[in-house]
Amino acid sequence: MSVAEIEEGVFEATVTIDNGSFGTRAIRFETGRLALQAAGAVVAYLDADNMLLSATTASKNPKEQFDFFPLTVDVEERMYAAGRIPGSFFRREGRPSTDAILTCRLIDRPLRPSFVDGLRNEIQVVVTILSVDPNDLYDVLAINAASASTQLGGLPFSGPIGGVRVALIDGTWVAFPTVEQLERAVFDMVIAGRIVGTDDEGKPDVAIMMVEAEATENVIELVECGAQAPTESIVAQGLEVAKPFIAALCTAQQELADVVSSRQAKPPVEYPTFPDYGDDVYYSVASMATDELAAALTIGAKLERDQRTNEIKTQVLERLAGTYEGREKELGAAFRSLTKKLVRQRILTNHFRIDGRGITDIRALSAEVAVVPRAHGSALFERGETQILGVTTLDMVKMAQQIDSLGPETSKRYMHHYNFPPFSTGETGRVGSPKRREIGHGALAERALVPVLPSVEEFPYAIRQVSEALGSNGSTSMGSVCASTLALLNAGVPLKAPVAGIAMGLVSDDVEFDGGTERRFVTLTDILGAEDAFGDMDFKCAGTKDFVTALQLDTKLDGIPSQVLAGALAQAKDARLTILEVMAEAIDRPDEMSPYAPRVITIKVPVDKIGEVIGPKGKVINAITEETGAQISIEDDGTVFVGATDGLSAQAAINKINAIANPQLPTVGERFLGTVVKITEFGAFVSLLPGRDGLVHISKLGKGKRIAKVEDVVNVGDKLRVEIADIEKRGKISLVLVADDDSATVPAAPADAGAAQEFGSGTAPADAATASS
C-alpha cells in the first residue's frame, strides 16, 4: 500500500481486498482533481465502474449559541450514475431516496463521535454518486469517502474511519460482495471502525464503532439446504473478520492525508471548542444536588422520576443563577453530567439500575392482538413504558412500492413504516413527513422481518406494516419488531418463524477495587431511554429462537473486548427467547384472514395469451374488472393475480380469464344466455364467452316475421337466449334464437357473467387456481 502522485498535485492511494476464490476488489482514493475549494475532497472508486465524490466543508465562524454539534451529512444520488433519466415529472432529482437517507445515517453514526467535543462550527459532508455498477452497493464506499475527505479537511477529527461490508457466503466471510454474490449469502454486515493503537503483536488495533447487520431474504432456505445459520457466535466471528479490512482502509486514508499535507502546505485553521460547562460550575452543582438527585434516581416510574429530577434541577438553577449569571446553559449541562455520573456509578458498583431492576431483567411485558377493528391485522406490544401499536394492511401485489433509486431494488413488496409522534415522550413537536430517524427505525424493523416473510408464490399479497410508537422509554424500534410479528400473524400472514427484538446497553469505567483500579464492563438488558443516553453502547438485536435476523450497534468506546461483545449477544438471545414466549401466549400461529382483507387468487396463463386477456388498450381486462368488481394484475411470465373482497367475485373473474386463455370451443347445438354487444344492418352480435361472439342474422330475429331494422327488435345490452346453429371453418358462429317454450332448458345467466353456457364450459378447472385466504 502506497500513495502515488498520478499527475501534478493529484494523489491516490489504493487498497486491494483479497477474497480468495471469491475474487479481489480494489478501493482507490484520489484527491487534488475535483472540488478543490472544499476543505477536503476525495473521489473514491470501487473497481472501475463505481465512482463517488465526497466533499467536506466547515463554516468559518462557530455557532456559539448552539448546544450541539452541527454536523450535516447529505448523499446526492445522480441518476446519470446508472445511465438513467429520473422518473419524476420534472425529470430531475428531488428529495433523497430511502437508500440515500439510510446511507447518510451509516456515515453520520461513526463520523459524529469522532469529532472533538465542544466543536460548534457547522460541518457539512456531501457525497455525490457519480457512477455505479448495478451489481454493486455504494453505501460502504461512501463511508470511506466521507472519512477520507474529512481527514483531508484539517478538522479536529480523530479518524480516519474505515467501513466494510462482509457477507457469509458458502461458509466464508466475503468483503465488499457483489449483489449477485449476496443472493447466496445468509448474513450481511456493514461494519465501521478506526485504528486506536496496536495490539500485542504490533498489528493495528481496530475499535468497532458501528454495525448494521441483517439476515438475507432467503436465509431459511439456504440453512435448510445445509448453509451455516447466522447464530450469535457466527456474528461475533464476522466482526473479527472485518477488522483487518478496516485497518487497511484506515491506513490508506491516513497515508493519503499525510502525503497531501506534506506536499500542499495549508495554513492551519483553528477551530475553537466550547465545553458544555466549566469545572467550577460542575463543582457547585455537584455539591448542592448529589444527595437529592441520587435519591430521585431510585424512583422506578419514569414520569415520577422525571418530575422529581426536574424539581431538583429547577431548585439548583434558581439558587446558582446569581452566582453564574449568563452561564445558565452551563448549569443545565453540569446537572445532566452529574445525573449521568450517578447512574453509571450505581450500575458499575452495585449493579443497580434506575428503575431497580437487575442487569439482565426485562421490564413487564404485554402482548395483545386484534385491537383495531377494521384493520387486516393489528397488535399492541408493551415493554414497561414503551408501547407500540402494529397495524398490517394487505393488498394486491401491484401495490408494491416502486423504487427509483441507484440501488438494485426496483420494487418492494413488504413496506415497514415507523411513526414516532411527540406525545410518545410527553412532549410537543412537529408531526408530518417522516424524519431520518423514523426512516432508519422503520428500515431496521423491516430488515428484522424480511427473512421470515413468505414468498409471493406462498402469499400473493403486498404487505404494509405500520409501527406507531405510542409510548417511548427505550427501544421503540425493537418493540416495533415484536408488535409487527404479532400483527402479521393476526392478519393471517404465514411467517416462517416469529421474530422478537431487544435493546442492550453497556456501561464501562475504571472502578476502584482492592486498593487499585480495574476496567469494568456491565452489559444491560432492555435499556431505558436514560440508560441509552448515559451508556457507552446502543446494541439492538432481533431474531428468531434459532438465529439473528437483524443487528444494530453504536458505541462511544475505543473498542469493546471480544468476550464482552460475545456475552452481550448471548444475553440478548436469552431476553429474546423470553419475549418470544410472551408473544406466543397472545398468538402462536397465523389467524384466519380478516373479512375486510382482499382475497387474492393466482393463476397462470400462456404467455402468448397475455395480449388477448388484456385486449386492445386494456378493453378486455377492464371489462372483466367492471363486470366482476375484481382487481387484476398480470405479470410478464403469465402469472395473473386476481383480488376481490369476496371469493365469488374473484372466481367469476378467473372464469372469464380462463375462457380467453384456456378456451373450450363451443359446439353446434350449445345454448347460451348472451348479451347483445353490437348491432349492424344485417344482424346482432351476441357475446357468448369472453372474446367469442356469434351473429344472429336479421332474418332470424323476427321469429318467422320479416323485420325492416334490427333495432326494432333488440338493442345493445339486451339479453338473448341463443343456440349455435353453425360454425364456419374460419370460426364464425351463426346463432338462432331459442323458442320461448324451450327457454327452460337454458340456465339463467349469473349476475357477474356476460354469458352462461348451458353445459358450464366457462367454469375454470378446479386445479387452475390456488387460493390464499
From Swiss-Prot:
It is found in: Cytoplasm. One of its GO terms (molecular function) is RNA binding. PROSITE patterns: KH_TYPE_1, S1. CDD domains: KH-I_PNPase (cd02393), RNase_PH_PNPase_2 (cd11364), S1_PNPase (cd04472). GO terms for cellular component: cytosol. Residues 749-773 are annotated as: Disordered. Its EC number is 2.7.7.8. The keyword Transcription regulation does not apply. Belongs to the polyribonucleotide nucleotidyltransferase family. This is Polyribonucleotide nucleotidyltransferase. It comes from Mycobacterium leprae (strain TN).
